[in-house]
């Protein structure tokens, strides 16, 4: 669950109460339905670096109690990621993973900043990575996950239409591509719908669909043990769907997380 507590300070609520309330819901989901979910706390680029640092400190306080990562979201243009470097370094120094929205509403230099200044472990959107092939190769070589959001990118005009999205090129180059919703409420989408859009618009094979699913689990901000268990569960589920996936499943069982 990725959100900014800064946007929920209503009726006297304070940061720790907000995170605690969210965690109660996630704990209940895990007990009742077996859903495993962590919290990613977001700083907001266009609000202030000071508030991002407060949220970074909040993330560190809740490390080991549900918070698994820190994000930097909000307007890219005129609000560079490097302005929030203090917040990013604070969470890094406390061994918390970082993902940063970059390359959605601004070009490849925004992605470069997120990676080389703020040292992000994942890139949110990354649509404009296609504009810098050298940086794209660097991202690929380091298996940095790229969190693509198809419906959202069309709605925000990051791309003119789905046919213009670089997902197919990214996949052909071997990038660790994942499919995401961005904002379910604003975009009116689901993870299932994002996969439907991908299959219908980019002629994905069954093996490619499995690859995208696996990339998502491999890129999760979870422990190696938890990710390994989830990957095994997913492969077992796909195996139950028939022989179509058998060759790819055998290969992926041998691959590294």
Regions found by a protein language model. Give the residues of each.
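Divalent metal-dependent hydrolysis catalytic cores, especially in the metallo-beta-lactamase
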Residues: 1-11, 36-42
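Glycine-rich tight-turn/loop motif centered on a GG-T
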Residues: 7-17, 77-81, 117-124, 152, ...
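Short, small-residue-enriched loops and turns at beta-alpha junctions
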Residues: 9, 44-50, 74-80, 100-107, ...
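Histidine/acidic residue-rich metal-binding segments in metalloenzymes
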Residues: 19-31, 35-38, 51-69, 78-100, ...
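Conserved, mostly hydrophobic/aromatic
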Residues: 70, 101, 123, 146, ...
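Active-site neighborhoods of metal-dependent hydrolases
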Residues: 124-127, 132-181, 234-257
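Flexible, acidic glycine-rich loops studded with aromatic residues
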Residues: 161-216
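Mid-to-C-terminal alpha-helical segments outside catalytic/metal-binding sites
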Residues: 203-257
């Amino acid at each position: 669950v990725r959100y900014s507590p800064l946007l929920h300070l209503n009726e006297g609520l304070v940061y720790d109460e907000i995170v605690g309330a969210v965690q109660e819901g996630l704990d209940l989901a895990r007990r009742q339905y077996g859903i495993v979910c962590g919290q990613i706390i977001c700083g907001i680029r266009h609000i202030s670096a000071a508030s991002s640092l407060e949220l970074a400190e909040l993330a560190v306080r809740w490390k080991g109690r549900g918070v698994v990562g820190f994000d930097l979201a909000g307007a890219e243009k005129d609000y560079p990621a490097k302005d929030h470097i203090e917040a990013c370094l604070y969470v890094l120094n406390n061994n918390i993973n970082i993902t940063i929205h970059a390359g959605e509403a601004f070009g490849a230099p925004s992605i470069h900043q997120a990676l080389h200044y703020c040292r992000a472990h994942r890139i949110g959107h990354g649509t404009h990575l296609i504009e810098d092939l050298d940086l794209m190769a660097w991202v690929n070589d380091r298996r940095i996950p790229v969190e693509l959001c198809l419906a959202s990118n069309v709605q925000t005009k990051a791309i003119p239409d789905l046919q213009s999205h670089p997902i197919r090129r990214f996949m052909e180059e071997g990038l660790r591509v994942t499919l995401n919703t961005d904002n379910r409420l604003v975009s009116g989408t689901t993870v299932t719908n994002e996969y439907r859009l991908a299959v219908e618009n980019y002629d994905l094979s069954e093996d490619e669909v499995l690859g995208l699913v696996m990339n998502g689990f491999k890129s999760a901000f979870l422990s190696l043990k938890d990710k390994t268990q989830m990957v095994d569960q997913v492969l077992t589920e796909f195996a139950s769907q028939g022989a179509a996936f058998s060759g790819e499943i055998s290969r992926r069982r041998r691959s590294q997380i």
